[in-house]
């Protein structure tokens, strides 16, 4: 096994490591890599859907997506498809997956199936480092406060992604409050747990003050020195700790630049704990 660090903030590409050979007996090595690097990448993984599910189940129960219908044989696997003529990219914009849930998923596994020849990278950001480097005046205000996280409903993907199908929860929206500074249940590290896609308000502050403070926090979270960037190739797998990272799928292969290509990914998510 060889470990190539991708940036000083987070991320590592793991070479000479076959994910379909992972069992409960050697899982701890994989989990230790994830806790250390927060997002880990593996190329040239000939891993089937059944093996992907087995891999995910080592981290915990695999959940179905709130809005998207999964594969017929594996409903917990969400197939993310951007057709060649579509502009939007699923996962565009900084976010932590399903932070609006009572128990947001703890781990996400992504598998690339079809990748555009140019563009389509994903950027990941370290929210433990974001907390460590946040201005002290902001820390003093938010350290013991909660924030409201609200989903956007399913309408956006029903309209924008023709190749993806709703599971029937068209009008459903979910809202939950979580600590702005959560604690990682495995490491004890502090995490800045808000994101511009789903976090709507700081509880206990007037709307104007909440909006202004969240905007300052979001600008801090977007700093490139908190991030790493991964260029996908087909049959690559990313495993990310959704508790302490955010990610952004870049939509830079739209036909307007002559780069209209299909992009297909599979996603599974592992049930998490209620943030504390």
Model regions: which residues?
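Non-heme Fe(II) oxygenase catalytic core, chiefly the N-lobe of the double-stranded beta-helix
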Residues: 1-237, 242-276
């Amino acid at each position: 096994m060889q470990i190539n660090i991708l940036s000083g903030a987070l991320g590592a590409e793991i070479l000479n490591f076959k994910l379909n050979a992972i069992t409960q007996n050697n899982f701890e090595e994989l989990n230790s890599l994830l806790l250390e690097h927060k997002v880990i990448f593996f190329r040239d993984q000939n891993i089937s859907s059944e093996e992907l599910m087995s891999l995910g189940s080592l981290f915990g129960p695999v959940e179905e997506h709130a809005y998207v219908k999964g594969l017929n044989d594996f409903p917990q696997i969400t197939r993310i498809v951007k057709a060649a003529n579509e502009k939007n990219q699923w996962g565009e914009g900084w976010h932590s997956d399903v932070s609006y849930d009572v128990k947001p998923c703890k781990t996400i596994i992504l598998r690339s199936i079809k990748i555009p020849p140019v563009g389509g990278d994903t950027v990941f950001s370290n929210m433990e480092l974001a907390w460590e480097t946040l201005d002290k005046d902001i820390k003093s205000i938010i350290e013991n406060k909660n924030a409201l996280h609200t989903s956007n409903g399913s309408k956006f993907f029903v309209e924008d992604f023709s190749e993806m199908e709703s599971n029937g929860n068209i009008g459903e929206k979910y809202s939950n409050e979580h600590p702005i500074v959560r604690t990682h249940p495995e490491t004890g590290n502090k995490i800045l747990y808000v994101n511009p896609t789903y976090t709507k308000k700081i509880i206990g502050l007037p709307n104007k003050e909440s909006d202004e403070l969240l905007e300052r926090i979001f600008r801090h979270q977007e700093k490139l020195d908190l991030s790493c960037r991964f260029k996908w190739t087909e049959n690559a797998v990313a495993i990310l700790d959704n508790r302490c990272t955010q990610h952004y799928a870049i939509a830079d292969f739209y036909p307007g630049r002559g780069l209209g290509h299909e992009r297909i990914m599979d996603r599974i998510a592992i049930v998490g704990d209620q943030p504390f």
